[in-house]
């Protein structure tokens, strides 16, 4: 019997690409399911003139998606796990975790530049990143940059910044790996909890067994470990807490 599944997603190009990855998996592995994507703009996508800790934290990226789940306008939500609050409502649990893409942060220079100079600030809003960058580049200054990845790259190429710090996973999923000037190893810059992993959120009590083979055990274990570590330290947008776990099972 055919079953319709609606997946909630933010409107940005990266968010839609990530959601389409999940949609393709379901359509390939569960051909009896009809899958649709419901895109929406979140509060975090709209408020761009202030840093996240000034306007309510990472919850601003999930509020509208959570409401769609609760109202049954959607059946799943796809998130970049690093952008999710460390505590999720009991009624809206994380039901699956993707295989982990590259968890590293990266340095991105303006087009045509091959070396980092410090005459302009590095575009970076994360306290986690800034604190670690101050060790790597003590002569650097920093300025807030908000917006989706493509908006940030445009601001960089327009001459507003000497460089950006972004997540490798997002650039790779956008097909923009060539923009990466330098990978920052975890020993240099510890990533955010869950970085590189997609978290799929559903409703408590519903049957999500169709995601069993999508769910990556190593990524799940690392994600839960990292998120628990940050929760214990009461870390959030205003706290420079980082966490990076490795699964030793297959090493």
Where are these regions (language model features)?
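Small-molecule-sensing regulatory modules
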Residues: 2-41, 46-47, 54, 130, ...
